[in-house]
Amino acid sequence: MSEHIEVSRKGAVNIVRMNRMEKKNALTRAMYAAMADAIRTADVDDEVRVHLLLGGEGVFSAGNDLGDFMAIAMGGEHGNEVFEFMDAMIRARKPVVTGVDGIAVGIGTTIHFNCDLTIATARSSFTTPFLDLGLTPEFASSVVAPIMMGHQRAFALLALGEALSGEEAREAGLVWKIVEPGQLESEAMATAERLAQKPPEALAIARDLLMGDRDERMDLCMREARLFGERLRSDEARQAFQSFMNRKASKG
């Protein structure tokens, strides 16, 4: 279990919180593994009805940890933990609610295409700088995003790298409700508790129907992952990452 993932229970709600604020909740392989385990363990617990995924104040997640990315790009690691997390999210029988305040970058954005209800603050920002790093979309976003928000808006988000504010994300269908920052966690919990009061089998079936074919979605994730992996090891991506790290270093 990663020290940066906090798992707790409130009634029938399984709460999974990212807590690596000093790195803006950038996700390491250990964090992915811990989240996958937390979701899978609670998903087979009859006392749990809903999963709730949270970040911190002003930060949901900055996306993948760049150190892990660089290790994979240099050919030393494979990073299967992220796919285990995707699989756990997609195959969860119980609904997943997310609460977002502040930045949601890369997979910090695409995760919400695989959740059921996302509550966010107006100051939240959803962005996917994949192409700027020589990469391509992931987590089934290449198909789910155009269905959810239309090709133009999805292409602007996933290819152009255009950020969506909290309200713009709500209008696009990525977010269900906008609340004030001080109300985010209480509203997210209240929503999860409302869901938890529903008949559990009916609730699980409803999620299954609305998610569609889980195998097909995971197959899509794996196709995206193969392309993502090829890109990650490409000269183009290595140069883009190096330029990014140089810019970051120059800013101190």
Describe the function of each predicted region.
Residues 1-11, 60, 161-167, 182, ...:
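C-terminal alpha-helix plus adjacent terminal tail
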Residues 31-34, 81, 111, 184, ...:
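Hydrophobic alpha-helical membrane-association signature
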Residues 40, 55-91, 104, 216:
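Glycine- (often His-adjacent) and acidic-residue-rich active-site loop
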